[in-house]
UniProtKB/Swiss-Prot annotation:
It comes from Caulobacter vibrioides (strain ATCC 19089 / CIP 103742 / CB 15). InterPro entries: RNA_pol_sigma-70_dom, RNA_pol_sigma70, RNA_pol_sigma70_r1_2, RNA_pol_sigma70_r2, RNA_pol_sigma70_r3, RNA_pol_sigma70_r4, RNA_pol_sigma_70_non-ess, RNA_pol_sigma_70_r1_1. This is RNA polymerase sigma factor RpoD. Residues 1-24, 194-236 are annotated as: Disordered. Residues 586-639 are annotated as: Sigma-70 factor domain-4.
Amino acid sequence: MSNNSSAETEAPETTGGDGPLLDLTDAGVKKFIKQAKARGYVTMDELNKVLPSEEVSPDAIEDTLAMLSEMGVNVVEAEEDAENAEGGEVATRDENTTVIASDKPAAYDRTDDPVRMYLREMGSVELLSREGEIAIAKRIEAGRDTMIRGLCESALTFEAIMVWREELGTGRILLREVIDLEGTYAAINGVAAQPAAEDDEGPAEPVDDEAGEAKAEGAEGEDEDDFDDGAGPTVSAMEGELREGVMAILDAIASEFEAFRKLQDKLVGSRLKGEDLSDADRKAYEGLSATIIQHLKTLKLNNNRIEALVEQLYAINKRLIGLEGRLLRLADSYGISRGEFLKAYFGSELNPTWSEQVKAMGVRWTKFVENDSQSVTDIRSEIAALATETGVPIDDYRRIVQTVQKGEREARQAKKEMVEANLRLVISIAKKYTNRGLQFLDLIQEGNIGLMKAVDKFEYRRGYKFSTYATWWIRQAITRSIADQARTIRIPVHMIETINKIVRTSRQMLHEIGREPTPEELAEKLAMPLEKVRKVLKIAKEPISLETPIGDEEDSHLGDFIEDKNAILPIDAAIQSNLRETTTRVLASLTPREERVLRMRFGIGMNTDHTLEEVGQQFSVTRERIRQIEAKALRKLKHPSRSRKLRSFLDS
């Protein structure tokens, strides 16, 4: 009994519809919590059995997970996950410690609710400590350094850098397109630079952990444009300050690369002759390589540029694999196994006497190099051309590709772990922006995009926690997506900011004067042209569907009550129909010739009216005769017996 009471006292109160879903007064739930605390974990299947069967909100599920976390209970996907987390110790349970399953539907064991499934997967990942964040950040940095170290051994990298140097000098590209401005600024100046004060460069850098977390918690009532631009230098200011130093580094790389390229060409030429570099040249080669790598680490290339270099490296590697595959298939046609071929081929890619050497390995090899000598020669010539293009021997190039792939793989895995460990942060921020035009899952996805960008930008040496820094990127991604996607008719971000400014001012003036301010008062308060205020207020109105139900019965729609300016009113249609019938009867009282002339002259019952000349041609008479017939017919119509039938239409 004491244990049950302690479980109740340690667990937070759950009152209200938005609290955790566990009823702490239920005996089954009490026993469930007691056993979960004793084990230190609970599986998602066990948790689903004690959750209520009715529809639950994502907020309530998140609060329940948070409550269990505060009680020291980890939520894992399955028993195996808990055993692995405890270092392989098997968690034993006997019949007495088995969780009593409640009489809830078994549907919760297998759910198709995407939010619940997402939260279930998210709950299986443990949160990171400050030390864990630093360890992962170091792994990301190490993976990136490994990639750069591999790229620096390829002449293609430096040829691309020389092109960038020339384009920077002529002004065809900007410095921000080549390097990571913030990282290079910090490396050259020896201080942690604040994020650049520009929309696309990133949100503001938090002052400290507590302040950042407090702002994150208070983000619920904020508008889409409430980002602090920070006090860091602008992008233009950074470029102006860094340009001279960056160009000096690029000049140094250019001068060192000239000597390095000569050594690379010498190395490839030696391998083509079956020789190798001398000890002095090898030492100079390694020294220049280390110096250039250090220069590039100081520059901190833009991620897009690194990706372009990696793609270039992989493209050549794909060509190399294709050539080697063709050579392997030729050898296979002569009964040479893959293992035999690779053993004889690796290390001798550029050996000019390779064909003669493999003849000594047997009859199959002799037939292979003699019968397909032209194909073998052509393929090996193309492979040698690739070595000349890359500036390194093929075996070294293959090692470079493996080094870059290893660094990329390690960095990607570390980033994945950092992202998965902070998915709860995205949930906590995204739920503050619900009911703003985007569904909850869409908000989560946009927040995850911001989280991934924060992982790329995070600098652990600055001293603050990752969650504090990532909050700003997540909020920015969510609010930008709301501005871009929430409205049926997209409004630009700068106009969204103007709308928010007017809405805030209108709300403030409502408290001051006790009524909604007029456009004139808003224009005066904001020092903004009246016409612009009117246009913004018009744009700010949300569109409404014509299919919106009207009334309690919902049997009519808004579109039923909107006037169609182009439609003919029923009364007008009736008048027109009656006028047509009356006119026909009145004209029928004339002679057929007079009726025909009037109908043609005034276009009654026809597409258009006709001139006297046209009517005369129809009756084979002169214009004057037609005019006389028309005048006589009109005099007859003026007689009261006929005119009174038409006069009522004239009055109406």
